[in-house]
Amino acid sequence: MTNEKRLLRARGICVIIPTFNNEKTIGEVVKETLCFCDDVIVVNDGCTDSTAQIIGEIDNITVVAYSQNRGKGYALQQGFRKALSMGFAYAITLDADGQHKPEDIPLFLKANQEHPGALIIGARPLQGVERSKGSDFANQFSNFWFFVQTGKRLEDTQTGYRLYPLHKLHGLSLLTNRYEAELELVVFASWH
């Protein structure tokens, strides 16, 4: 076990990976994540492709699964509940599509050591990345809506690469179950 893995475990940090039909990427994402953290929870959000089989073949992970797709927000809530029941204090979330780099997990550890109890949001490199106009608009609108709700500015409210202090989420009931739940979580954290 590496020193960083020991520090993650000592601080009670796990990684949660929600997935819906990511058969092309999930195996590699989970295996790369295991190189940086031994405590990985994968939430199978009603996958209908071979994702369940792929994650079932990976040792040393915890899988939460249910048959009907309920949305990313619901999957995150299930992952948070599982992490809390396992005694974790924090959860790093990353997407199963490969857009987040597991090698950045130590950066979350460092930020958590410097700012314990804070929600840490990883910033994606948005400049020079080819994205659809719809995706670009959605992110800009989400950033604007966050500002309206909180008076604070964030460059990328849509990134799923975050570290959550789980005690602050205990008992939280989200209004939404899909992708917008991530914005709801950031607004909630800003208010508290």
Give the location of each predicted region.
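Short hydrophobic beta-strand elements that form part
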Residues: C14-P18, I41, A65
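Acidic helix N-cap motif at the loop->helix transition within catalytic regions
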Residues: K24-E28, D49-E57
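Short beta-strand/loop segment that forms part of the nucleotide-sugar
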Residues: V30, D38-C47, V64, L94
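Acidic donor-binding loop at a coil-to-helix junction in glycosyltransferase catalytic cores
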Residues: E180-L185
